[in-house]
Amino acid sequence: MSLLTIELQKEKRAGVIPVLIAVGILGAAYALVNFFVRKNTLLSLPLAPMDVLLTQLYGTLLILNMFGIIVATCMIYNMEFKGNAVKKLYMLPVSVPKMYLYKFLILTILLLIAITLQNLALIKIGMTDLPQGTFELPTLIRFAAYSFITSMPVLSFLLLISSRFENIWIPLGIGVAGFLSGMALANFDLAILMFHPFVVMLKPAVAMSAQPDKSIALVALTETVLFLAIGFGLANYTHYE
């Protein structure tokens, strides 16, 4: 049995897979119900219909995704930390850094699935509820890709934190603190705040346009790779809480 298959079974048993799939389904349901209830109010806003569709619904979807990431990353090392099992892995013919990469890959794919489910709901809304001729599928795809990319630094950062601490309350506390501080700082247009992964994730939600910001996307990709590289490097060492 391959290490990837083992990881998939562990994440399913730990509840990681159901959590992020549920986030996708819940987000899609929220978008459909919210637009159905507030359709006239939303379409009366002084914004282009595509900007209304993407920016006015994305805030809550982002919060769902963010807390889904926080919960999933807190749970993903649960089995390894039981009975100090993670320390025993170093005595087995198992590559712990490779295991870390597989966890990152699984979380990334699950987040992508969740965002895809949510955007399928937005496509349905755009095709049936926006004024005739105003729905632009390429614009939605670009924004979906942008929101996925800007979410990755938080995922990469929290996986790193979760891998280093056995106490689940530490990554959970850091995740909640990151969310609260990110909410407080996201509206400030200061370059130094881009070092804050939660601020990066929140940027699409505070923008009034559905057009992706290439500089923010570049920062997000850089931070994702940086946190992944640090986590991969630290996985070679057995120092845990």
Question: How would you describe each model-predicted region?
Answer:
Residues 1-24:
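Aromatic- and glycine-rich beta-strand/loop motifs that create alpha-glucan
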Residues 1-9, 77-90, 144-169:
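Cytoplasmic juxtamembrane interface segments
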Residues 19-25, 165-183:
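Pore- or pathway-lining transmembrane helices of multi-pass membrane proteins that form conduits
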Residues 33-53, 172-241:
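Terminal transmembrane helical anchor/hairpin motif
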Residues 67-81, 156-169, 224-237:
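Transmembrane alpha-helical segments in integral membrane proteins
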Residues 76-108:
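Helix-loop-helix units of permease transmembrane domains in multi-pass membrane transporters
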